[in-house]
Regions:
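Catalytic Walker B motif of ABC-type/P-loop ATPase nucleotide-binding domains
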Residues: 99-102
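Helical segment within the ABC ATPase nucleotide-binding domain
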Residues: 113-127
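Conserved H-loop
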Residues: 128-134
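Hydrophobic anchor residue at the start of the ABC signature
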Residues: 24, 88
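Conserved ABC transporter NBD signature motif
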Residues: 4-16
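Short helical segment in ABC ATPase nucleotide-binding domains corresponding to the A-loop/adjacent helical element
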Residues: 37-45, 55, 59, 163
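Conserved signature/switch motifs of ABC ATPase nucleotide-binding domains
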Residues: 73-76, 94
Length: 191
């Protein structure tokens, strides 16, 4: 058990008050007593972003995730995909340098998953945010990633890191896509 030390990101100590990291979890998480707009604004208020900047960021995120008409709705009034879009908008609204996503689409059906994956690609392109996307879904990893890190069954052991040279958006039935998916599958089978 560590008793002392530092956590570094890009060589800089992580300070909870100044960190520029956002998170999206498998379980969509919204504050039930806040509206969609207030949920998206939450991280901006914690970071003490000016009202003008917060207003602009919230408007931009509502537009990008297609929830402008639902800004005054509460989480109990939203579908699962809408709740996940709120989580995505809240995470990107703070303009993080690093976004950690842990199985964010695990509970969604395939159509919603594809739609949100495409929205996520648009956000990545627009913001330039570095994203660590954790998934058990090989096709999702190949579809979204620039690099694929295959872990072993030991928590901190990396089996390999593969570059994904396929251009975005990716064609899931192309020979190149299928070949890379099969390569990742083979790596997982043989540890």
């Amino acid at each position: 058990e560590p008793t002392a030390g530092d956590i570094l990101v890009n060589g800089i100590p992580v300070n909870p008050k100044t960190q520029n990291i956002s998170y999206i979890f498998q379980e969509y998480s919204s504050f039930p007593w806040l509206t969609v707009e207030q949920n998206i604004r939450f991280g901006l208020e914690i970071k003490k972003v000016s009202k003008a900047e917060a207003d602009a960021n919230v408007e931009e995120m509502l537009d990008i995730v297609g929830l402008t008409k639902f800004r005054d709705y509460y989480p109990s009034q939203l579908s699962i995909s809408m709740l996940q879009r709120v989580a995505i908008a809240r995470a990107f609204a703070t303009k993080p340098e690093l976004l950690l996503m842990d199985e964010p689409y695990g509970q969604l059906d395939i159509d919603l998953r594809f739609k949100l994956e495409d929205e996520l690609i648009k956000l990545w392109k627009k913001t330039g945010t570095t994203v660590l996307f954790i998934t058990h879904n090989i096709e999702e990893a190949v579809y979204l990633s620039q690099k694929i890190m295959v872990l072993t069954n030991k928590p901190t052991s990396v089996k390999t890191i593969l570059d994904n040279p396929l251009p975005l958006p990716r064609d899931v039935v192309s020979e190149e896509f299928v070949a890379l998916r099969n390569q990742v599958t083979d790596l997982i089978k043989w540890w």
